[in-house]
Amino acid sequence: METITKKARSLYIPYAGPVLLEFPLLNKGSAFSAEERRNFNLSGLLPEVVESIEEQAERAWLQYQGFKTEIDKHIYLRNIQDTNETLFYRLVQNHLEEMMPVIYTPTVGAACERFSEIYRRARGVFISYPNRHNMDDILQNVPNHNIKVIVVTDGERILGLGDQGIGGMGIPIGKLSLYTACGGISPAYTLPVVLDVGTNNQQLLNDPLYMGWRHPRITDDEYYAFVDEFIQAVKQRWPDILLQFEDFAQKNAMPLLTRYRDEICSFNDDIQGTAAVTVGTLIAASRAAGSQLSEQKIVFLGAGSAGCGIAEQIIAQTQREGLSEDAARQNVFMVDRFGLLTDRMPNLLPFQAKLVQKCDNLQHWDTENDVLSLLDVVRNVKPDILIGVSGQTGLFTEEIIREMHKHCPRPIVMPLSNPTSRVEATPQDIIAWTEGNALVATGSPFSPVIWKDKIYPIAQCNNAYIFPGIGLGVIASGASRITDEMLMSASETLAKHSPLVNNGEGLVLPALKDIQVVSRAIAFAVGKMAQQQGVAVKTSAEALQQAIDDNFWKPEYRDYRRTSI
């Protein structure tokens, strides 16, 4: 039976002439038809030939290949995004594996560092502390009324690069690009926001080109009052928004999430998204080895909000697999710069306190050190899994990895710190130090490793496997909150799509070319769980799937019809 493709309805717009060509969400460039050129006063403003979007994308791809550095490629792609968003997303989807590291990690890190230098055109909303009493007016200036997803940062902890001030805006822009490219959320529904509360980066304060508020960061009550004013303004403007907190400093990330997750539909991708993709990866890796995650001993290097968030989700998963909470917590060991977190360690943050090991249980350990180092922990715990979220390069030393491999034939090693310059160890070294026996997953993209004439593909434990599907699921289901169970359902769905589990070979995570399929599946699982949890209206499975399909935007041009303002 012949399949009939339903043509998208015409779009009625009031803009014409040069104004239309300057509107990135509506501009088609050389793809405006002859009729549209007449109707919208575009005759003579474009070359004669009417092109298809694929012809435009092919030209853009050829131009892209002419740039030699990743930052120049990033600037070029951002220019297309600010000129013709539909073409931008068609190009990115056509070359996702090539371009994802350019529009997001690791290249976005350099773009944030050089934000004021490479700035060309405004995108998103910049809310500075001196303008804190004008937030309602600022948000009213946003031309898109139907915003459904906001990614917001204050620029204080950008990847592993620290305080980038207003340059942190590169992260929400890049993140929302992936919401669209991977999760099918229309760019018309997205809004990047930076809260400009100053910067403590002296290099930026001394930079004559720096475009942010030249002031040390506000803190404490002033800071939290400012963020609260922003949250209330967002709720007033877009009551049903999905708000993602991104790259806030450790001291603020967890308090903000705790404070607002039950007030507005929100989540923190650094804490919850990273945890969800990591747990999904570990579930898949454990199943591929014929075991369960609850049978593994896990050591973390890095006990910040991200590391502790991952640990808590691992504990929740192993409880689902049958462990008691106490037994689940005894399997997880957190190491930070002061050593293993124990019940005798002072000045722990509240989210760290639940993840300590009891010193009474460590009496038999083979060590004479008062401060238990990562090597001490690996030697005594004999872990199956080693996870790095320290933001410091080179801390997974050869001695540590070889010690781990001595007791674990197939170690799982996950140096997750971003960007690549901050990774705890390179996949090449880990593969060599374990004689080719380690399963490696990284936070940033790495090329396959060749060791002793064998090719080892390296899985990227990328949050983009998770957050676009969560966003799509929330929008499609109308969920009012994001619960822990919704995040767990995303992890489980990701694990079910593992080629290593399903085929007995290949990567532990799906290929990036399949990420839209994965995002759709996660959206359904998240939406279904939202209904079960009572944070979304219950519908049939068919209705939920239809809502996902209806909300899945594709980078295709629609016919335009003229209307009055």
Curated annotation (Swiss-Prot):
GO CC terms: cytosol
Top enzyme class: oxidoreductase
GO BP: malate metabolic process
GO molecular function list: malate dehydrogenase (decarboxylating) (NAD+) activity; metal ion binding; NAD binding; oxaloacetate decarboxylase activity
Pfam families: malic (PF00390), Malic_M (PF03949)
Active site: Y104, K175
Residues that, per the record, bind NAD(+): R157, D270, N418
Family membership: Belongs to the malic enzymes family.
HAMAP family according to UniProt: NAD_malic_enz
Protein name: NAD-dependent malic enzyme
Source taxonomy: Bacteria, Pseudomonadati, Pseudomonadota, Gammaproteobacteria, Enterobacterales
